[in-house]
Amino acid sequence: MNTTNENAQKQSVWTQPMAQDQFDFMSTVLAAPSPIGFEAAMSYGVIKPEFESFMPASWGVHQFKGSASIVFDSHPGRDDLTSIMIVGHADKIRMQVRKIDEDGKVWINTDSFLPTTLIGHEVKVFCLDPEKSGAYKSITGCTVEALGAIHFSTPAQRTGEQGIKPESIYLELHMHGEDRKAQVEALGLRAGDPILLDRPIKRGVAADTFYGAYLDNGLGCFSVTEIARMLASEGLDKVRVLYTIATHEEIGRFGSTQVVGEIKPDVLIATDVNHDYEAAPGIGSRNMTPLKMGEGFTVGRGSVSSEFLVQTLANVCSEKEIPYQIDFSGRDMGTDGMAAALAGVDSAAITIGYPIRNMHTSSESAHTGDLLASIHAIAELLRHFNDFNNGNGITRDDLKNSHIRLDNL
């Protein structure tokens, strides 16, 4: 990189600390209580009001019967324009009440958490309020437990040779006295009630880092909103952008699949977390791509991703000196980028990621520079598509004829 380019990058947004008001909004997004099946707290409670504060009156909003997914449409009704959907998912992996025992223990389902990472952490339980018909309430001050004490563990558990089984995990509500099960039921708890980690994000020790629960994937929803905020006043008029907050990703990409199946975008861009493989203990020996937190966002190649989109984004980033890292996808992207394939919709797809540490724990950590780089990269990609064909915009035929041929080398 020459001196001129180096000086330009030093002034780039992604090399600077995230503005406090932007960090505060990100914190608000990540704090939304939006467990799987209850995503409206984020999509309707946080994201929708934020969009309404800046989006032009001409934009439209798509809502859905079966989920709290929501789509903000830059050009409603303009089916002549090539449509580009950017999607983040609002659902958080959650625990659930499974059984209330006679001694007051509440046995819970740990979902996509590793049981040992949950023990001792504070959580919130959400349940119907028995005193207010149809209303929900939250219960705080609960912890997740397993053995009760190290004194009750087996020798193999103490050495680490034996782990903690998911069915050993329970919720500690500190009930005592007689009829402890009745005490728990009187709070309103019943099977299926969702439980979330109570761990808001905080600034990290190293510069421009932060940590906490549920970066997966409030970060994607935050990014979608920030991209829209950046482009709302520019009036891109040659592409139709569909800013999407989806649901049920963690249990099968069901929300995005339903939304894509209904709206049928021409291009699908998924934004989600990825792994910092370089820092993950023992992972380097598995020969994974050495993705690093703080070195730029990630772009997945493989699976059903469009090589044309990958190379176009890479070229845009190179031109604008935006840092990115290439990752590989095997048979499945593992994100909402699969939604079009799962829905049977003809869309060119790509996945954008943020390399984080400690995924699916209470201490997920990330770098604000990676987020800011991805936001600007996707915004630049949309501008590029808008300027395609001498300012006439990218067409569906462009996409249909974009497939890389290895026989023309």
Provide a role label for each language-model segment.
Residues 1-409:
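N-terminal hydrophobic/helix-forming segments and targeting peptides
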